[in-house]
Amino acid sequence: MLINRKLWSPNWSNRPNGVRDVRGVILHHTATSGKSAVSVANYFANPSAGVSAHFVIGEDGYTIQCVALGRAAWHAGTARYDFNRDGKIGADERAVNTHTIGIELCNKGDGKDDFPDAQVKACAEVIRYCDRKCPNLQLRNVTDHEAVNLRGKIDLRPNFPAAKLFWWIIHPPKPPSRVYAALPKWAQRQVDEIKR
């Protein structure tokens, strides 16, 4: 995976079982105009910010890692997501950060600002990398902040090209360890539409 830079944030918590705790990925937009991946990562590097993400991806695909995969970044806030659909792992609103990778995409978040192909391809590459490094990550648990947040977050906006993202996740230059069958049914339908 191409990580252009590492700029570590002090805003993280331990995962009890390291990368084995990771079950999903939460996608965010920065909701900032004209901010680069570097400026967002610099913000995360500030201890008083109290927030972070594992990765920040600029519009040009420039990727910065801010938190190690074995640590929990502070990206989801008050959130809930039942990763195994069994009422246990992640159903507790405090556990979502423990069980997810956070990826911030530099974007205004106004529903009009496009997500360039270079950025979406880089995001797919990051997710494939996480899939290789985190043995319990399930691609069906790649979701956005709106799906897990309990306080009305709206990222990602409807103009995010989810079908392209999932297409590039399952059609990389080298296939990932787990592919199409592991995707959620809605993503499989979108990928099928692209194939036609």
What are these regions (language model features)?
Residues M1-N136:
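Active-site-adjacent loop/helix surface patches within enzyme catalytic domains
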Residues L2-R5, V19, T98, C106-D192:
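Basic/polar, cationic surfaces and motifs that engage anionic cell-wall
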Residues I194-R196:
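Predominantly recognizes leucine-rich repeat
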